Amino acid sequence: MNKTELIHQVAERTQMSKKDAGEVVNTVFDVIAESLAQGDSVQLIGFGNFEVRERAARKGRNPQTGEEIDIAATKTPAFKAGKQLKDAVK
């Protein structure tokens, strides 16, 4: 399912227009992204948790030259599924 299909499903199930459903879906995504950008986690009980994880600096290799390079530490968004979501998928 892509974003357009998600908006269509939300519109059908809530009797909203596709435009309104699209605004709701986009707003939810924006709020999650803004919270993560501020360093907060988003906990949706039964669904899962969105959080920012830090990846430590590490050594790597340039595959073309074999030269060892330093890879800087980074922050990356992560999602961990909740129990209800895991059970629904089984």
UniProtKB/Swiss-Prot annotation:
<dbReference type="InterPro" id="IPR020816">
    <property type="entry name" value="Histone-like_DNA-bd_CS"/>
</dbReference>
<protein>
    <recommendedName>
        <fullName>DNA-binding protein HU-1</fullName>
    </recommendedName>
</protein>
<dbReference type="GO" id="GO:0030527">
    <property type="term" value="F:structural constituent of chromatin"/>
</dbReference>
<dbReference type="InterPro" id="IPR000119">
    <property type="entry name" value="Hist_DNA-bd"/>
</dbReference>
<keyword id="KW-0238">DNA-binding</keyword>
<comment type="function">
    <text>Histone-like DNA-binding protein which is capable of wrapping DNA to stabilize it, and thus to prevent its denaturation under extreme environmental conditions.</text>
</comment>
<keyword id="KW-0226">DNA condensation</keyword>
<dbReference type="GO" id="GO:0003677">
    <property type="term" value="F:DNA binding"/>
</dbReference>
<comment type="subunit">
    <text>Homodimer.</text>
</comment>
<keyword id="KW-0597">Phosphoprotein</keyword>
<dbReference type="Pfam" id="PF00216">
    <property type="entry name" value="Bac_DNA_binding"/>
</dbReference>
<comment type="similarity">
    <text>Belongs to the bacterial histone-like protein family.</text>
</comment>
<dbReference type="GO" id="GO:0030261">
    <property type="term" value="P:chromosome condensation"/>
</dbReference>
<dbReference type="GO" id="GO:0005829">
    <property type="term" value="C:cytosol"/>
</dbReference>
<dbReference type="InterPro" id="IPR010992">
    <property type="entry name" value="IHF-like_DNA-bd_dom_sf"/>
</dbReference>
<feature type="modified residue" description="Phosphothreonine">
    <location>
        <position position="4"/>
    </location>
</feature>
